[in-house]
Amino acid sequence: MRRKTKQGLWAVLLAAAVACLVPTVTAYAIEGWNREGDEWQYLNREDQPVTNAFKKSKDDWFYLDERGFLLKNRIFSFGGDDFYVDQDGRMVRNAWVFIDSEKDPDGNYGDSAWHYFGADGKGLRAKGKGFRKEIDGQAYAFDENGRMLTGWISDEGAVLEDEDPFVNARYYADADGALYTNRWLYYDWGSHLTSEVTGRSYEDYEKMWFYFGADSKKYRSRAGEQPFQRDIDGQTYGFDEKGVMIEWWDKVASISDAVRSNPTSDERVRYYSGYDGGALMKSKWFWMYPSANLDEDQNRDLECSWWRSDAKGRAIRNKIYRVGEKEYAFDGIGRMKTGFVLFDGRHEFVAQYDVDAWDAAHFINGDIYGIEKADLYLFSPDELNDGSMQTGKEITVELADGPRTFAFAPSGKAYGNRNILQKKDNKFYINGLRLDAPEEQGYGVVSQNIGTLDAPQYRFYVVDRNGRIVNGRRVLRAGDGYLLVANGQYVGYCGDEDAPRWKNDAFYHYDRSNRQNHYAGGVVEDMRTPMTKDKVPDELSVFEAD
């Protein structure tokens, strides 16, 4: 009996020793979706519900509210943008949604109205003067809350509902929200006002017609007593200062005096209503519109413009021309052009666009007529007082979607001209536009093809909000994750809670809560594998080279 007891004691001691050799293993929950009663949650690795965040299931995104449950049938703000989730909790994309009190119980978005949510789920809304948005080829207007606008709309995006809303309005939208574009509008409400151009009361008008051009803006006179002239479907029409078509108009005010602020001599000059291409005064500026027999093109644009005569009294045509210390652009019949102007060389006018005719995406994608085969210049939009060529690297231009920075060489040509990405002073430009990171992300990725279209060789650079290229090795906070840079190149992105760390010539996932091994998550991205465009998250892609 005594011997047996001794053997049992040794067995107990041996078992205790073995237990000391086995390391303690911390148990973690499996991250993922969890059903709680009739509702869904998303549990993290600590088995806690994720709150106030988007999570993906297959191809759909879902939002978890402050309680950690799916939000349903609700419009809400997240990260400075508006989103809508349907009755199943899915984020709605590329769709119209009528938002009423049921979908907006707190009344954060004003009166009931239609809203549109794009491919990224973000609701379209006005940002500064950028309230005009295109959806499936049709233009619409939205206010700062994302509500679709209808009726008469001002240049600032305000709906006008006074007695004569057409006076200060620039746009018009029907009940379906579509802005009138290249389209006539018949106004049958009448008015007691008087036209400054014709001196006639609108009560004398049999009908009141308005026309809205390709940019959805109402045609109107900007030259005091002179009508605004346009060829529409082969016929020439005149419009007064309020945009009303002048039905009986032929030509108004044959000769008058005007003073040009800059540039000009101290002498007063004249503008003529019927210039026929003959000799003018020498080396002078003229404010006028051309006569019907000046140009062979029957679809020409007949509006008042500045013209310049040379030393022989001939109108300057189809060239960029120096006057004093400044340069100006003139089209094929001699009209001075302002805004964005395209020339093939310096002696072949191609096209002109108002600065607010396009948004940044059009310059990035090259979706502007003539921009691939012509040189882009910028001439001051202040037609009455300047109009000269603009050069420099920090020129702020008010585009349709807000202010953006452009740069032009001393010659006046845009950096990144003819739709070719250009690196200049540690920044990238395309068609003059500086490529800046999205404001909400802080950093973005620009891909550049240093090879050919048949044999591309891509380089991936990271830029900040001011377009500066990030050099060296960096871990950068971008949106809800981290953007990784090595040797001045983008090498990966991860949405970890903790910032990745550099170790053994690679970026590793880092988990500060894992005390046994902070680097258990392994390498974020194998840098021996070539980077490809599909590894750049859409929200971080600033420019994608062909």
Predicted regions and their residues:
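Extracellular adhesion/carbohydrate-binding repeat motifs centered on closely spaced tryptophans
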Residues: 2-546
